[in-house]
Amino acid sequence: MRLSNDNEKFDTCLAASDWRYSAAIVGLCKYFKYYKHELGYELSDDYLKFNAADITEDRYLKFAESYFEDQFQHRELEKYMNLESWSEDQTKRINELLRGNSVMKKVFGKIRFDGNNSEEIRELIQINRSELIRETFRNKSNLYKNFANPGQLFKERGICCRLWGYYVDGGRKTKALSYNFDVNTFVSQDDPLFDFIPFAFWGDREVFFVNDNFSLEQLIRTNETLEKQVQMQVTEEQKSK
């Protein structure tokens, strides 16, 4: 649940009223820790307090690029472009990346890497970085799209929740989703802060989040422990291959 906190140091206050707000709080805490030298916040047993103006699209995208770095093809491409020479296999991989998904095709068009145009590719990445992050993040099936309607990323509060299982397309018939076939009984509160839910889940093929919300500090600790356990398991699985 989101509360206004007027005339206080922080103007926004979140409580873990259900799993959605619990997960959003975990994601937001990671966001604020990433910007710990720029932004302030307070976490108590009951509330996460912060200033709403500190949540911006530019900051969100920069955080997402860092947090899910290995999921962004432009980051892999960027690392290749920082090399001084390239093997045949590396050149092949670079050209695969240039057409890796819809937004990569849009940004790089018909460009093919020939060993002499690394600076051109670097410049295109830098100029189009926000679009590359946003479109990849919202449309990739194991990122935002795994949790919410990709068309709702960065949208203001809607008439129904952006999360799958709660989202109702207003242009389609929705009676089957409502108790006793009455659409007016379908309750689905939305909040732009639900965009932080993907950062609360951990896993590889399956993702997990523990709603241990006896207190917010306990919630954070439990999910930090889960994160470490999943990382260890993934590392062990990679070693055994």
Regions found by a protein language model. Name each.
Residues 141-169, 178-194:
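Extended, Lys/Arg-enriched charged tracts that mediate electrostatic binding to polyanionic substrates
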